[in-house]
């Protein structure tokens, strides 16, 4: 399953930057070589060992556990026997360990706890290097103004305040630390996962690898079909990015899809099972309160969140309050002993433009703010999930209310889709909203693929969704004034104006596609040095004419 990195990203090499506080830190970055290899720029890389051609990966063994020593050296964890899970051995990960890590006392082992106690962890230095390295540019035509350096101390302060998170379960030591917060690069998430209708373990593992190679910062496994536990194990053991899940899906699977048979004990066992596997963040739909359900009655599309609909159905069947809400402190107690991050789910998000910014949506958001306070009291890391389907003129209100209710906890939104009329193109309708909401301060954007509302995404859909959202996140970073975003735009525009076609391809988000589109009309090698393309031809190229004007003036 090794992908040819040199084909996808020509003229790129993997490079590692060492830490200074912790000298055993090695942060992987991608260097793009340009100007006939005389210059280069450094870019953020999410692929881990999957984008290092020097590393041989055996997916049956998983990838290197780069954080294991950092975790053990803190001396606040101990090994426990993993709870037994009935899995189909035919599909099980072959090297599944029976030992897991957990806090050795009642003290939290979260990045927030360390940050609040003035401890800079290796994870904090790691993300500071990742965020800051892009600003260290060796191009001669660099911008004159650079923003202040992102230091490990700044990272610590942001995490202590709750404005940023590092999802990093101690049982996922393979993950390369990354940070989600409005004062950092805008991140993107890719959803994968099987259904009862389609897909296999191999398919989902391949989707994960493609997603991170093209730039997904986190991946959510939303499997609802067969072999949920096994799929997740394969993904986690081979993933260098944080993995998120919606545990209520597997809990419902355990009761054969009968919502009324769910209870907190089943959910709790599922939570611990996934915590022991190494899931880095959980979507918990604890804000769907019984009294809020009636507010969805007049909606055009009702409740469109799967988790939200499950919990609303359960509340209605039993005429009781949401057990995720009533047992929230106990959930916090589990999370803090593994350092699992809350992704507080928007179970009442709007599923159509007609339902955007309604009472149900904002009642739930207010409750998520109250739950954030409770989680922070336990030193648990938190991000807040957001919509959904929102027209452009209503997007800003979502961010303003989230900041107010949730006290600047990172916002994580699904798009939002800005119109409902384009099935098959919802990666575009949503990337428009994602760019806008990212500009307003959303920290992570959950991708939408062309298959949204139509079916289970395949590998090409995953790639298309990731690229669309890398564009949205990058556009938001530009609008926010992030210098690392500006650098790459500047370099590509320089290459374009000077007809350096290979540099233009290689600096793009998808070099393979850029080159293939150019090759459709001008496939010859000579065309790669021509001062025109097939759009204008040699006589009408505005940039060529501009060069001629300059030569006359000189």
From Swiss-Prot:
One of its GO terms (molecular function) is carbon-carbon lyase activity. Substrate binds at residues 191, 220, 249, 285, 305-307, 346-349, 385, 412. It comes from the Bacteria. Keywords: 4Fe-4S, Iron, Iron-sulfur, Lyase, Metal-binding, S-adenosyl-L-methionine, Thiamine biosynthesis, Zinc. The keyword S-adenosyl-L-methionine applies. It holds the Pfam family ThiC_Rad_SAM. Pathway: Cofactor biosynthesis; thiamine diphosphate biosynthesis. Its EC number is 4.1.99.17. [4Fe-4S] cluster binds at residues 533, 536, 541. It is an enzyme of class 4 (lyase). It catalyses: 5-amino-1-(5-phospho-beta-D-ribosyl)imidazole + S-adenosyl-L-methionine = 4-amino-2-methyl-5-(phosphooxymethyl)pyrimidine + CO + 5'-deoxyadenosine + formate + L-methionine + 3 H(+). Binds 1 [4Fe-4S] cluster per subunit. The cluster is coordinated with 3 cysteines and an exchangeable S-adenosyl-L-methionine. Homodimer. Belongs to the ThiC family. This is Phosphomethylpyrimidine synthase.
